[in-house]
């Protein structure tokens, strides 16, 4: 049985419809120093357990999503629209 991703726009869809683009990190402010930017661009964790990633629904709604999954079991805990999440974080 294929793994299903709970797309907030299309419903449960096979993982093959998505392209994983990497960690869902908070971007440094535009005026951040070069060390912060270096860390953001080049340094990545390789965690075991819960992890958030950007996924693109390339064969569906073509929206960017933030998928929370376990890197050991690959179980998906949550999925939300990346644009909506960015707006909610900006209000904080």
UniProtKB/Swiss-Prot annotation:
GO cellular component terms listed in the entry, alphabetical order: cytoplasm
EC number of the protein: 1.5.3.24
Catalytic activity: sarcosine + (6S)-5,6,7,8-tetrahydrofolate + O2 = (6R)-5,10-methylene-5,6,7,8-tetrahydrofolate + glycine + H2O2; sarcosine + O2 + H2O = formaldehyde + glycine + H2O2
Domain of life: Bacteria
Keyword Zinc on entry: yes
GO terms of biological process kind: tetrahydrofolate metabolic process
Pfam families membership: SoxD
Subcellular compartments: Cytoplasm
Keyword annotations of the record: Cytoplasm, Metal-binding, Oxidoreductase, Zinc
Binding site for Zn(2+): 7, 10, 57, 61
MF GO annotations: metal ion binding; sarcosine oxidase activity
UniProt KW Zinc-finger keyword: no
Quaternary state and interactors: Heterotetramer composed of subunits alpha (SoxA), beta (SoxB), gamma (SoxG) and delta (SoxD).
Entry's family note: Belongs to the SoxD family.
Function: In the presence of tetrahydrofolate, catalyzes the oxidative demethylation of sarcosine to yield glycine, 5,10-methylenetetrahydrofolate and hydrogen peroxide. In the absence of tetrahydrofolate, catalyzes the oxidative demethylation of sarcosine to yield glycine, formaldehyde and hydrogen peroxide.
Name listed for the protein in its UniProt record: Sarcosine oxidase subunit delta
Upper lineage: Bacteria, Pseudomonadati, Pseudomonadota, Alphaproteobacteria, Hyphomicrobiales
């Amino acid at each position: 049985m294929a793994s299903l991703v709970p797309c907030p726009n299309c419903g449960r869809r096979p993982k093959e419809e998505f392209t994983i683009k990497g960690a869902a990190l908070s971007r440094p402010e535009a005026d951040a120093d070069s060390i912060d930017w270096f860390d953001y661009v080049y340094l990545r964790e390789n965690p075991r357990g819960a992890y958030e990633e950007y996924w693109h629904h390339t064969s569906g709604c073509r929206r960017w999503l933030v998928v929370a999954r376990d890197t050991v079991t690959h179980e998906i805990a949550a999925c939300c629209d990346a644009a909506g999440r960015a707006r909610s974080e900006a209000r904080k």
